[in-house]
Curated annotation (Swiss-Prot):
Any Gene Ontology CC annotation: plasma membrane
GO molecular function terms attached to this record: purine nucleobase transmembrane transporter activity
Entry superkingdom: Bacteria
Signal peptide as annotated in the record: none
Coiled coil: none
Role noted for this protein: Transports adenine, hypoxanthine, xanthine and uracil. Transport is probably proton-dependent.
Protein's name according to its UniProt entry: Nucleobase transporter PlAzg1
Subcellular location: Cell membrane
Family affiliation: Belongs to the nucleobase:cation symporter-2 (NCS2) (TC 2.A.40) family. Azg-like subfamily.
Species of the source: Paenibacillus larvae subsp. larvae (strain NRRL B-3650 / LMG 16245)
Length: 441
């Protein structure tokens, strides 16, 4: 078959034979990945609209940045990975930065853009190793686990399973309240689907919960199910970069950078191992993969969404046999179709009780990183513990990271192990000490 679509040429480009896969397998794998990650198209705009952003604008931005980043890593890296806005870091953006600190979402986008620009420089140079090596492994895992606790806490609040209390700060909500009861049922349904390993359990769980919400009178059906993509003008190029250059926002920017680099690097290595793409313990073509993520972070800020990351949900497509960039390309084709279903997505997201179960489960899934913390080493374990526990309790990911850095350095000094601390970590700890102790309000 010659012409624009030459099958043999594409088979050679994607190395189908070398990686022991076929067109059929790659297509099925792409569909599988789509089913497991499509919930993000609902949850990400739902979270960011809580911060005052336009839902439709974020929805279109989410799809576009996913397409841009994923096509780069698929075509130039030939990896079966999908890149999209990350769960957890979007909650940090909306609830910790914008709502808790009162920072305009436009300034938060400016912070994301600055973090993405630095990420891009790191991806193009060898300095990315400098940043990765500076942060202790235990703290890296603690940051991911703490973010999971944070997003789980947000989910419990949205479900009103946890509510504020003047006596105990928080308390158990009224389980007989219709919305709370709906979230409990939705969580149970989703867990049932996951128990039976149903692909797309999170998304299907939201669909079932939405139907129940409509039956209970908690949700109105959209007047139409399809629409021309719109709203991007409300979020694209709205970022405020000038407002980023103060101590508090630089701490936020540093946090965006850390989480983006750590999550991206860790997830890609894990997925590459699952797909059998590691060569002698090395991750081949890592630069192109990192560039795709860095470009995604910066373009996401320009379009109007929180930082992106390589999705762990890509593992479902790999488990289905996906081994090349064809897998995410199939996912991208399906994503283009979903762009026209914004009214349906907005309806699903309009009731926080519907998306709450997904947040709780996503948060839980991030806790598996806790097992990698060196719990038998006090100076490694205690700072990690503080990072995890202070994230949800302070509603601030950046403050929790700063506390972890400071305590880690102090404990190493107390133990006479100053040489074990990377020189850059001393600078990071001092930066957060000044920010938290003298500037943060």
């Amino acid at each position: 078959m010659k012409g624009t679509f030459d099958v043999s040429r594409w088979e050679t480009w994607f190395q189908l034979k070398e990686r022991g896969t076929t067109w059929t397998t790659e297509i099925l794998a792409g569909c599988t990945t789509f089913m497991t990650m499509v919930f993000i198209l609902v949850v990400n705009p739902a979270i960011l609209s809580d911060a005052g952003m336009d839902f439709n604008g974020v929805y279109v931005a989410t799809v576009l940045v996913t397409l841009i980043s994923t096509l780069i890593i698929a075509l130039f890296g030939n990896f079966p990975f999908v890149i999209a806005p990350g769960m957890g870091i979007n909650a940090f953006f909306a609830y910790s930065v914008v709502k808790a600190q009162g920072i305009p979402w436009q300034t938060a986008l400016g912070s994301v853009f600055l973090a993405g620009t630095v990420f891009l420089v790191l991806a193009l140079t060898r300095y990315r190793r400098f940043l990765l090596d500076a942060i202790p492994q235990s703290l890296k895992y603690a940051i991911t686990a703490g973010t999971g606790l944070f997003i789980c806490f947000v989910g419990l609040q949205n479900a009103k399973l946890v509510i504020s209390s003047p006596d105990t700060l928080v308390t158990l909500g009224n389980l007989r309240e219709p919305g709370t009861l709906l979230s409990i049922i939705g969580l149970a349904v989703t867990l049932l689907l996951m128990t039976y390993r149903i692909r797309g359990a999170l998304f299907l769980g939201m669909i079932v919960t939405s139907v129940l919400a409509w039956i209970m009178g908690l949700m109105q059906l959209p007047s139409h199910f399809l629409s021309i993509p719109s709203g991007l003008a409300h979020t694209a190029l709205q970022l405020d970069i000038d407002g980023v250059f103060n101590y508090d926002m630089l701490a936020v920017t540093f946090t965006f950078l850390l989480i983006s680099v750590f999550e991206t690097t860790g997830t890609m290595v894990s997925l590459a191992e699952q797909a059998g793409l590691m060569k002698e313990g090395r991750f081949p073509h890592s630069r192109s993969a990192l560039l795709a993520n860095a470009v995604g972070v910066t373009s996401g800020a320009l379009l109007g969404t929180s930082p992106i990351t390589t999705l762990v949900e890509s593992g479902s497509g790999i488990a289905a046999g996906g081994r090349t960039g064809l897998t995410p390309i199939v996912t991208c084709i399906l994503l283009v179709i979903t762009m026209f279903f914004a009214p349906v997505a907005e309806t699903l997201a309009s009731t926080p009780f519907v998306t709450a179960p997904a947040l709780v489960i996503v948060g839980f899934s991030m806790l598996e990183e806790m097992v990698h913390v060196e719990w038998k080493s006090f100076e490694e374990a205690f700072p990690s513990f503080l990072v995890m526990v202070t994230m949800p309790l302070t509603y601030s990911v950046s403050s929790a990271i700063g506390i972890g850095f400071i305590v880690y350095v102090l404990l190493k000094l107390f133990r006479g192990k100053a040489k074990e601390v990377h020189p850059a970590l001393y600078f990071f700890a001092l930066f957060f000490f000044i920010q938290l102790g003298f500037i943060h309000s």
